[in-house]
């Protein structure tokens, strides 16, 4: 998916004036116009109005400082013919996918693993050692994939490939700090204004923009904001043929209330299961999230009308929308009021008693935040139970080795914020972004 701001001028691969640099790029740079003006002021001359060309001139001007100046969803690679160096980066949230294969002197990269199949040097091998992780949490919680020697470039990271050596560095890290200097009303205005500006930035395109709409607050908020400036924006919703499982009536009711055209389709059980094999092929790796099926049909329907859609994904991680974030507040209060030794004792006793109201709270209240997170996100808490599903034994890490290193990096933060930070580096990156990326849909 290439740039839309300059449909003709943005053709790729794109070269600089003397042909020494070449760039390929997937995504959107929302602040490309501001960067373009800055580069023109620095003496650069542009032949197009595309953001691909901004990347080329930006690399000439700023080198590996370029990714830190970009606002958007992107992956890009620039080859420097003079230095025989390859440079690339992925956006800070990992919205756009980037896979690479690095083995026996062969370096391949792409937005999809299946693109590597066209190269005769690519060895398609199952990465069996990662099966225990996948069965435990339903995704691979690191840079590896289910294919041997195929890796994911982490979000907020850039890489350099030179003389057969690959170097990966982080250019951005999500940081949290508490600012008590403003009132609730002031923060409400700041968030509202920032949200409106962000939605406007996402609509910079030469083609019509639509919106995905469910019955949730996040997508409803996006559609409502878009409709303020684009009254005839189309909303797209999907539901199930069995009404009791469908959110479609709520989405259509909201569309009607704000005066936005609603385009909807329904999925029945037969369609659901028939489409699953094809969907897994598109996603390259196994994906157990059931939302993949309705999303596939939603995207198929939307593409008949528009090329670009906005959605509300990522809001739960950013604004603390998941139930476990709210539960964490109660655990914090419990920890402040009850000494650790007493909490440990209460949890140990409760775990041995028959079920009673409050038992699970006492058991979880005796645990560390990473243990509570693991309990909420694991399919198999017992490695022995998980390993019984496998045909052979693998040297897999214990459950605590998956998430504890992430929590160790944010120990000084309150528990809800720790959960948000970990989700942004794991669940959102390896599940949500893969599921909702336009490349897969």
Say what each PLM segment does.
Residues 1:
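Active-site loops and adjacent core secondary-structure elements that bind or stabilize anionic groups
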Residues 49-84:
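Catalytic core of PPM/PP2C metal-dependent serine/threonine phosphatase domains
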Residues 33-53, 79-185:
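N-terminal segments that mediate ammonia production and transfer
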Residues 419-435:
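Alpha/beta-hydrolase fold catalytic core
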Residues 27, 55, 159, 255, ...:
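Residue-level signal for inorganic ion chemistry
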Residues 41, 81-108, 175-403, 435-441:
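ATP-dependent adenylate-handling active sites, centered on carboxylate activation for C-N bond formation
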Residues 31, 48-51, 70, 127-128, ...:
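Hydrophobic (often cysteine-bearing) scaffold residues that line and stabilize catalytic clefts
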Residues 4-24, 74-77, 141-152, 197-201:
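Acidic loop->beta-strand submotif enriched in PP2C/PPM serine/threonine phosphatases
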């Amino acid at each position: 998916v290439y740039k839309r701001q300059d449909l003709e001028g943005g053709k790729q691969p794109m070269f600089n004036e003397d042909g020494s640099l070449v760039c390929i790029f997937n995504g959107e740079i929302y602040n490309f116009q501001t960067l373009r003006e800055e580069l023109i002021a620095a003496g650069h001359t542009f032949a197009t109005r595309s953001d691909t060309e901004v990347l080329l001139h930006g690399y000439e001007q700023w080198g590996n400082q370029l990714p830190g100046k970009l606002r958007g969803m992107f992956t890009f690679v620039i080859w420097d013919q003079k230095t025989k160096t390859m440079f690339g980066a992925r956006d800070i949230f990992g919205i756009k996918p980037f896979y690479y294969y690095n083995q026996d002197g062969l370096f391949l990269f792409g937005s999809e693993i299946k693109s590597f199949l066209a190269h005769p040097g690519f060895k398609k091998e199952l990465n069996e050692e990662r099966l225990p992780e996948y069965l435990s949490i339903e995704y691979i919680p690191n840079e590896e994939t289910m294919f041997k020697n195929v890796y994911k470039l982490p979000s907020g990271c850039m890489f350099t490939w030179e003389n057969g050596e690959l170097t990966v560095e982080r250019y951005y890290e999500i940081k949290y700090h508490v600012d008590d200097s403003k009132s609730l009303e002031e923060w409400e205005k700041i968030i509202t204004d920032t949200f409106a500006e962000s939605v406007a930035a996402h609509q910079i395109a030469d083609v019509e923009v639509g919106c995905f709409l469910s019955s949730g607050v996040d997508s409803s908020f996006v559609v409502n904001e878009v409709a303020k400036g684009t009254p005839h924006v189309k909303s797209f919703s999907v539901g199930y043929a069995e009404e009791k499982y469908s959110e479609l009536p709520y989405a259509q009711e909201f569309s009607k209330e704000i005066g936005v055209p609603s385009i909807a389709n329904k999925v029945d059980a037969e369609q659901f299961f028939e489409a699953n094999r094809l969907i897994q092929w598109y996603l390259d790796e196994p994906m157990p999230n059931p939302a993949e099926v309705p999303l596939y049909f939603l995207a198929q329907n939307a593409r008949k009308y528009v090329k670009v859609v906005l959605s509300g994904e990522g809001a739960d991680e950013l604004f603390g929308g998941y139930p476990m974030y709210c539960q964490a507040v109660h655990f914090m209060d419990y920890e402040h009021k009850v000494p650790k030794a007493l909490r440990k004792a209460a949890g140990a006793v409760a775990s041995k008693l028959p079920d009673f109201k409050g038992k699970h709270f006492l058991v979880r209240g005796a645990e560390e935040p990473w243990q509570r997170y693991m309990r909420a996100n694991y399919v198999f808490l017992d490695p022995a139970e998980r390993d019984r599903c496998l045909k052979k034994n693998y040297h897999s890490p214990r459950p605590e080795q998956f998430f504890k290193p992430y929590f160790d990096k944010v120990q000084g933060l309150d528990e809800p914020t720790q959960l948000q930070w970990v989700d942004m580096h794991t669940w959102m990156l390896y599940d949500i972004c893969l599921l909702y990326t336009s490349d897969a849909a």
